[in-house]
Every structure is written in structure tokens, then in C-alpha cells.
């Protein structure tokens, strides 16, 4: 993203030049969902974008994926005038999730760990131990990154961090109950199948496919999820390594 000094050095002229370059060279993906004839839609889109600067379209750049942490766990901290702390943990997953098989396994792991209201982070860290106002995990498939977000009382930072990591360790050791497994399967497959009911979710789904260079539909991914075994999810969990920890504390905390 650059630095504050680099941002301050940008001139209006340079910014406009870069803007025109982007219009001329950036790849453009147009997505349509509806009942109109595709040929008619294409004609309308071409007319609407005919005024764009015309240049050689650059391919989407490959995303840099760091498979494992480069060194010891990094810690970052900010202090603001806030009444609730934030604790965010960043993990490397051992690689990106681009194939149908790897995405299915990653989705199931995330659902078990912290991606649903039946997950370990929600039921144990938030509900049972009351260490967080909220605690959930998110998987960046194309970057190979897992992030855990939580809202924490200032006095509970250490305990919350330890318990978040303990729940990951439980997944890595295969300590996943049948109830957790079935709940995760229902959640992931249900979410994929209902993607077909919402235009916005379909657009988001296919944008991810374009970026990753794949083209399998939500129904196929749901079928793949149904074939995943618990052992395969545990293998996915075992590749995950802690990389960074960020805390937002109060100015007096």
C-alpha cells in the first residue's frame, strides 16, 4: 500500500495519469445475471464501455503466497481512546486454496474452527469462557491466510490469545466431535447451495473463480465438500502456523 510519505508526494497530474493507464490496461470482467439474451447484454455492455481508453489489457497479476512464517511470531500494537480491545491473529496456511478439493477442505476447517456459530471459537472462547465479545475466523483462499478477529476486554488479552490457539491445536490433534463435524458440513453445503438464490453472492463467487483461474460452479463445490473426510480437514489444520498478532488497546490499558 505504500507509506504516508509516498502518499503525500502524489500530485493530481500523476494520479490522473495513473487513472487513465488503469482504464486502458486493467483487465475488465463483466458479470451478468438475469433473463435477457446474453448477446443483447453483450452489445449493451460494449456500447457502454466503448469510450474507455483502448490499450493492451494486462493479465491479473499472480498473488504472492507465503507458505509459512518467515521467522518468529511478529507482534504489533496500537493504543486508542477505546473501551474495548481488539485481538487479531494472522496465520499462514501452507499455501493458497485454489483447487476444488483444497477449497472444500479449507471451508470445512474454517467452519469448525471459527467461521460459524457452532465453531470452537464461538462456543468455547466466546460462549463458554466469556473471553471475547466476538471471535471468528476468516480464510483468504487466494492468499493462503487465516485470520482470527476478536473483541476483548483489556484484562483478557493473554487468556483469549491462549484459548484461541488452544482451539486451533485441538483441530490439529483431531479433537473434533461428531456434532461439530456435522454442523460444519451442513453450514458449508447449505451456504454454497443457497448461493444460487442471491445475485450478489453469485457475483462474489464467480469473481473469486476468475481471480483464481478456476470455473467450477457452487453446486460442484458443494458436492466436493460432501466428499471431504474428517482426516483431510485435520491435515489442512496441521499446516496452519501462527505468523502475526495484533492488539488494539486503550490508552490507559
Give residue spans per PLM region.
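Charge-rich, well-structured scaffold segments of protease-associated domains
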Residues: 1-59, 105, 127-253
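M16/MPP (pitrilysin/insulinase) zinc-metallopeptidase core fold and M16-derived inactive scaffolds
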Residues: 112-130, 142
Amino acid at each position: 500500500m505504500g507509506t504516508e510519505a509516498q502518499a503525500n508526494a502524489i500530485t493530481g497530474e500523476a494520479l490522473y495519469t495513473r487513472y487513465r493507464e488503469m482504464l486502458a490496461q486493467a483487465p475488465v470482467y463483466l458479470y451478468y445475471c438475469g433473463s435477457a439474451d446474453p448477446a443483447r447484454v453483450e452489445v449493451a455492455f460494449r456500447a457502454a464501455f466503448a469510450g474507455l481508453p483502448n490499450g493492451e489489457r494486462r493479465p491479473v497479476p499472480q498473488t504472492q503466497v507465503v507458505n509459512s512464517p518467515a521467522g518468529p511470531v511478529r507482534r504489533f500494537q496500537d493504543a486508542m481512546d477505546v473501551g474495548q480491545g481488539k485481538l487479531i491473529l494472522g496465520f499462514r496456511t501452507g499455501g493458497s486454496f485454489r483447487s476444488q478439493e483444497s477449497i472444500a477442505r479449507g471451508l470445512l476447517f474454517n467452519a469448525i474452527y471459527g467461521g460459524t456459530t457452532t465453531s470452537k471459537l464461538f462456543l468455547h472462547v466466546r460462549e463458554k469462557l466469556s473471553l471475547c465479545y466476538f471471535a471468528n475466523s476468516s480464510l483468504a483462499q487466494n492468499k493462503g491466510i487465516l485470520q482470527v478477529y476478536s473483541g476483548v476486554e483489556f484484562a483478557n488479552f493473554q487468556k483469549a490469545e491462549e484459548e484461541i490457539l488452544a482451539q486451533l491445536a485441538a483441530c490439529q490433534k483431531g479433537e473434533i466431535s461428531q456434532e461439530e463435524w456435522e454442523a460444519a458440513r451442513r453450514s458449508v453445503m447449505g451456504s454454497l447451495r443457497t448461493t444460487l438464490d442471491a445475485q450478489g453472492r453469485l457475483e462474489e463467487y464467480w469473481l473469486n473463480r476468475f481471480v483464481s483461474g478456476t470455473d467450477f460452479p457452487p453446486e460442484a463445490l458443494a458436492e466436493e465438500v460432501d466428499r471431504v473426510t474428517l482426516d483431510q480437514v485435520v491435515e489442512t489444520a496441521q499446516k496452519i502456523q501462527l505468523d502475526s498478532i495484533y492488539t488494539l488497546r486503550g490508552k490507559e490499558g
